[in-house]
Amino acid sequence: MKKIIAIVVLLLAAHFVSAKDIEITDVITQDDFKEFTKEFGSALLFSPMAPAEPLGITGFDVSLEMVITDISDDKVFWKNMVDDGDPYSFIPVPRLHVQKGLPFNIDVGAMYVAMPDTNIKLWGLEAKYAILEGSMVTPALSVRASYSKLQGVDDINVDTQSLDVLVSKGFLMFTPYAGASLTKINASENSALVTLDDVSETGYRGLAGLQFSPFPLLIINGEISYGETMQYGLKIGFRF
């Protein structure tokens, strides 16, 4: 348990060192804004970080997550979108994620992000329906819808929606899962430096993950996904 706590602390500490404000500091083009929306919006997506199987009517899942998204930091538009003009090659998003099981194979959840020393705040909601619950011999199959909203950034507004199809199968302490997502990212700007049209970008992502339960109640989850960008996630929490 001490090692697990140490990992969480190190992940969050790495984020604090990397924190930067998002703001438009110089002129960007409409094409730049579209590319920024794709990459930054991908980092804000409410990724599943969980298998397809339902929690059950009494189930809870409370966890800390770190989701890291690669970005094209060598592009000029990124230099004009962070306060110091020196972007990192990734965006780390630490999340508090809570899920609750409901009747009829439905799970609902929420996540919240408040990045210290930055202007970035983020919240999201999700709902998942298990078409197949899964069993000792059959996989679980579910559909999931999610929404996330950026707050705290004066120069831009961003919200995202996604629709996921997930499949998973448990084996002892391990539950591998995979899925595909249809995503939509909406962005607009409020800067005095530019006048740009609103952007709405639709895309697709594939994902794969593995949930590991070394002890009762404790879960460790790793997930990778690929679409406009590569994304890597780690989750540590309690499921009961």
Each predicted region: which residue ranges?
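Residues on the lipid-exposed face of transmembrane beta-strands in outer-membrane beta-barrel proteins
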Residues: 51-53, 64, 96-102, 125-129, ...
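Residues that define the transmembrane beta-barrel architecture of outer-membrane proteins
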Residues: 56-58, 89-94, 119-123, 157-161, ...
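Transmembrane beta-barrel domains of Gram-negative outer membranes and organellar outer membranes
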Residues: 20-135
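Outer-membrane beta-barrel strand-turn architecture
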Residues: 56, 68, 101-104, 131-137, ...
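Outer-membrane beta-barrel translocator domains and adjoining extracellular loop/strand segments
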Residues: 74-79, 111, 119-125, 152-159, ...
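Outer-membrane beta-barrel translocator/channel fold
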Residues: 143-201
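Transmembrane beta-strands of outer-membrane beta-barrel pores
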Residues: 66-70, 112-116, 131, 145-151, ...
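Transmembrane beta-strands of outer-membrane beta-barrel proteins
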Residues: 60-64, 108, 125, 139-145, ...
